[in-house]
Amino acid sequence: MTASLVVLPSLWLILIIFTAPYTHCTQSGIYIDNGKDQTVMERVLTDDDKLDVSHEILEFLGIAARPLHHKSHGLSLRKSAPKFLLDVYYRITAEEGLAIKNKSDHSRSKRDANESEQNFITDLDKRAIDESDIIMTFLNKRNHNVEEMRHEHGRRLWFDVNNIPTDNYLMMAELRIYQNSNEGKWTTTNKQFTVTVYMLRSGGSAPNMLEPLSSVNTTGDYVGWLELNVTEALHDWRVNSNENHGIYIGAHALNKPEREIKLDDIGLIHRRTKVDDENQPFMIGFFRGPELIKSTSGHSTQKRTKRSTLHQRKKSKSEPVNPFIENSIENTRSCQMQTLYIDFKDLGWHDWIIAPEGYGAFYCSGECNFPLNAHMNATNHAIVQTLVHLLEPKRVPKPCCAPTRLGALPVLYHLNDENVNLKKYRNMIVKSCGCH
């Protein structure tokens, strides 16, 4: 048997999905430990209960509304931007050592061996990944209505950045373009080129002025991703969306900067690139967000009060089903980490959360009795409190069993049909327990 739970601190509610492997039925409800190393159902949760919990957790995680239904994760993951985030996701889970269940249609820990993995996540990316809370990707909008450029050799790209939350601080933004020398005109290391990204600005007599942002050097035989810094452009677009006229990509020979060459000649941004092409150009934004786990006080109190009232009205439909449960079960085991599994699928989130399908959250449970052993990770204060409790048990309580170390949970999800986000929720997974 497997048991999975969802803990919601603001409601003090535990939702557990319990599946028997030899049957085809699944029940959702509240399960508790009966003190004899057995997990038993205390009561069944109705569909309304689960919907209530789902809304509460969305608010708890700082997601304003449930993203729209997405038909196929597999189709979207063929695109370049989601593939990048999927690699980032697996890198984070590997470093955190998370016990996470992932869907079978994308259960890979790295890109295919024939792909240029070594330059897909750079050292600069790794630092930005570690420091950021939210990573957003943006694909080029091919159908955006813009004026044609007079520069026939380069390419113009445009990204819709209107969905970025205003309270997120931009750390860095990168443009990724793929070079495939096999499709180019020059395929030798003797040919060196400079690729430059420009921000398109309007003003004056010229309809579009080119403001250089960054450049990168490459060779004619290079195959892989090129990274260009576009932080200034994304920052300006967020301040004033009317200034978002896109960017322009140009290239020239290293020894002839005055002569622009066709990007096709060095295998860059081919005109026949499809929307779902895994080498489609994309932009990455690394952000530091506010505390992602929202406070349980303030403006949301009224909403929770209404839902709690609704929960009380529905309680008659979900009364205890096990008459052998004693409400005053005392856990006599010493403080230790217990298994707790969160299942997103039972909340109906499998159509917009790409990964994970579920994760091990764990929890701390048990007594902090004298003497406090080494495995209890007791603080000095807890040791003193235990001794005082022996002398004055009615005045001073025993120390509490609580997490001593917590880990982050990465969640990869569809914002809409065009954009995929990766959020890191800190302090979501118990790593160790102790007496405090």
From Swiss-Prot:
Keyword Coiled coil in record: no
Record GO terms (molecular function): cytokine activity; growth factor activity
A Pfam family assignment: TGF_beta
Any one cellular-component term (Gene Ontology): extracellular space
Residue span of region Disordered: 293-322
Propeptide feature ranges: 28-317
Keyword ATP-binding (UniProt): no
Homology family: Belongs to the TGF-beta family.
Protein name as catalogued: Protein 60A
Source organism per UniProt: Drosophila virilis (Fruit fly)
